[in-house]
Amino acid sequence: MVKIYAPASIGNVSVGFDVLGAAVSPVDGTLLGDCVSVTASDSFSLRNEGRFVSKLPDDPKENIVYQCWERFCQEMGKEIPVALVLEKNMPIGSGLGSSACSVVAGLMAMNEFCGKPLDKVTLLGMMGELEGRVSGSVHFDNVAPCYLGGMQLILEQPGYISQDVPGFDDWLWVMAYPGIKVSTAEARAILPAQYRRQDCIAHGRNLAGFIHACHTQQPSLAAKMMKDVIAEPYRTQLLPGFAAARQAAQDIGALACGISGSGPTLFAVCNDSETAQRMASWLQNHYLQNDEGFVHICRLDTAGARLLG
């Protein structure tokens, strides 16, 4: 039996729309991500478990893990009879890379079970393709960090889908999911088709400055550059309470605050545990909207998807 855990991820990280992503895991050891188990069988089967299993499609063939198995078998040129179990621990439409978790765990589990016939670049390419079936377009800002770990800059060049960006050991990422769903397609549709020149210049400056600050280990500069002029100004209207949370983050002393992916999850970066706890407490009391919501204090997950058994 092979069991793979794939961690949650922050798409965009404010400053890098569609080209930057970061994997995160709670500091308390909670598994914030999906697991897929594979065991040998006489015929294919897929069973769903986990806290958010009720949100999955009724038709098994619409389940992205089924599609991962189907695509992997196509790549291998044969049907591989296995019993799959998806532990859906991630809310769908949360902005935490939920579909990426399932895709990464599903494909990596099949690859491990079959003795790693596919290399990392090939497998990552397939992950982006499968993710595209869910979100409507091929993109790697969730699957790359989820699979490889840490913070990933998406390059999409032959042989270089992404490259690792060094993070900051002191940073704590407070993640708050309010318990409501935001459709990625809807969040994309709200964005303008064209941007003003000054916004393009600001975006280029912010992203270049952030990447430079990461590589030269200047955390205060990196935090200053974490500004989103591409998506956040438009998506805020889809996120009840985000503007108040961003102001609270500033008042409490967080280094930066932004939308995780297309939302509704937000993240706040803090450089000490006391500030992170205060931020988490505020979000727990003011940003969560129902019992499905949660807050986790996280660090960058540098390991990425990994074997649990």
Swiss-Prot record:
- GO cellular component annotations of the record: cytoplasm
Q: Which gene encodes it?
A: thrB
Q: What is this protein called?
A: Homoserine kinase
User: Coiled-coil regions in this chain?
Assistant: none
Supply the enzyme class, top level: transferase
Instruction: Name the pathway.
Output: Amino-acid biosynthesis; L-threonine biosynthesis; L-threonine from L-aspartate: step 4/5
Q: Name the family.
A: Belongs to the GHMP kinase family. Homoserine kinase subfamily.
User: Example GO molecular function term?
Assistant: ATP binding
Name the Pfam families for this protein: GHMP_kinases_C (PF08544), GHMP_kinases_N (PF00288)
Q: What is its main location?
A: cytoplasm
UniProt-listed HAMAP family: Homoser_kinase (MF_00384)
InterPro entries given for it?
GHMP_kinase_C_dom, GHMP_kinase_C_sf, GHMP_kinase_N_dom, GHMP_knse_ATP-bd_CS, Homoserine_kinase, Ribosomal_Su5_D2-typ_SF, Ribsml_uS5_D2-typ_fold_subgr
Subcellular location(s) of the protein? Cytoplasm
Which keywords does the record carry?
A: Amino-acid biosynthesis, ATP-binding, Cytoplasm, Kinase, Nucleotide-binding, Threonine biosynthesis, Transferase
Origin organism is: Yersinia enterocolitica serotype O:8 / biotype 1B (strain NCTC 13174 / 8081)
State the Gene Ontology BP annotations: threonine biosynthetic process
UniProt keyword annotation of DNA repair present: no
The cross-references to PANTHER family, in alphabetical order and at most eight, read: HOMOSERINE KINASE, HOMOSERINE/4-DIPHOSPHOCYTIDYL-2-C-METHYL-D-ERYTHRITOL KINASE
Catalytic activity reads: L-homoserine + ATP = O-phospho-L-homoserine + ADP + H(+)
**EC number of this enzyme:** 2.7.1.39
Function recorded in the entry: Catalyzes the ATP-dependent phosphorylation of L-homoserine to L-homoserine phosphate.
Binding-site residues, ATP: P91, I92, G93, S94, G95, L96, G97, S98, S99, A100, C101
